[in-house]
Amino acid sequence: MAKVYWPYFDPEYENLSSRINPPSVSIDNTSCKECTLVKVDSMNKPGILLEVVQVLTDLDLTITKAYISSDGGWFMDVFHVTDQQGNKVTDSKTIDYIEKVLGPKGHASASQNTWPGKRVGVHSLGDHTSIEIIARDRPGLLSEVSAVLADLNINVVAAEAWTHNRRIACVLYVNDNATSRAVDDPERLSSMEEQLNNVLRGCEEQDEKFARTSLSIGSTHVDRRLHQMFFADRDYEAVTKLDDSASCGFEPKITVEHCEEKGYSVINVSCEDRPKLMFDIVCTLTDMQYIVFHATISSSGSHASQEYFIRHKDGCTLDTEGEKERVVKCLEAAIHRRVSEGWSLELCAKDRVGLLSEVTRILREHGLSVSRAGVTTVGEQAVNVFYVKDASGNPVDVKTIEALRGEIGHSMMIDFKNKVPSRKWKEEGQAGTGGGWAKTSFFFGNLLEKLLP
């Protein structure tokens, strides 16, 4: 038999450019009095801007300014960031993590795209099964879903739910309470999916969209996955009408223009500033297959201004009015999805099966609807954060809040915060430190901070 010789290809060939020109990350705390400068230089590659922004936002850092340039083969960014209290980033663990993940040994694309959810300090979710739910929103839905899981002796380790345009998207990370391992029995998974779908079918009367439950084997970043679920559900097609409490401070203005000289489409976003705004916009553009070549991000008080120079991945710009309108609607939806006005409720208790079901049941019994929710577990402690409104979508009165405190305050740590919507920046011209967006992470509220070493 004649020998056949094949050319040898080094499996690391694709990473050759990165090894020859490794990424460079520097943390500068001397150039600016008010913030920390994070400078990233690396070989350009698809999705790299989202990867970097994702790392910074997962650490609950606020991006106050940014300058992006990635035209050609090199990617050069400068981010002005502060911590949750508006101070420079001085924590050595945070700085080391940024340098490690974004630096030569970080391989950000590999580690961040496979993380099972947003980073929770040094804590991991462990072995788990991911459940994704998209359905029409209604009062008590989250309570019914969590009750089904509790009856099946399935524990919710972490979860996040958003609502927008009468729809709810939710990602839950669960495990078997008896083994603390992922639920992998086919019959049990089938039963769980069937029972959840039965709950969701009750939401879809007189609605042209379908509810669905899926068991995810992927591990996309949870915030990005929620954006993707809403985008696939075409939530941007519905007309968004904010209520009076929300509209007084949050109406984004988005324009799309053409840059003849360089052949870019230029997107300008002007809106009220809030945490993770840049992530939501960059995430949406990336998932719509647009590449950001240049960008300038700035914020002043409660106002944010962001400018992006983009092309589609096929090299085309936004030439038709239909394309421009679609991008504007999708960005508006991405901005609105994370908006939550009114009372936030933070609860901390020993983790157990049925805890989420119990808390959401109590909220429902008090006539409250959950507009946004986050659940995480630190050791044996579960931390739940809920943004609530009454069943009609109106702000919750103080009497209801006090009744909640009296009913559940004896069995778990509880903290209420009222996020008063700030006035439009052009009317106030002041920083939104009094009302506006609280300097509190969605997952890292005061209660969780007490648990961390």
Swiss-Prot record:
A Pfam match: ACT
Disulfide bond residue pairs: none
Triggers of expression: Down-regulated by abscisic acid (ABA).
Gene3D superfamilies named in the record: 3.30.70.260
Organism in which the protein naturally occurs: Arabidopsis thaliana (Mouse-ear cress)
Protein name (database record): ACT domain-containing protein ACR3
Domain ACT: 37-112, 130-212, 266-341, 344-423
Superkingdom as given in the UniProt entry: Eukaryota
Any one Gene Ontology molecular-function term assigned to this protein's record: amino acid binding
N-terminal signal peptide: none
GO cellular component terms listed in the entry, alphabetical order: cytosol
Tissue expression pattern: Expressed in roots, cotyledons, rosette and cauline leaves, sepals, style, and pedicels and tips of young developing siliques.
Function of the molecule: May bind amino acids.
Keywords in alphabetical order: Repeat
Classification of source organism: Eukaryota, Viridiplantae, Streptophyta, Embryophyta, Tracheophyta
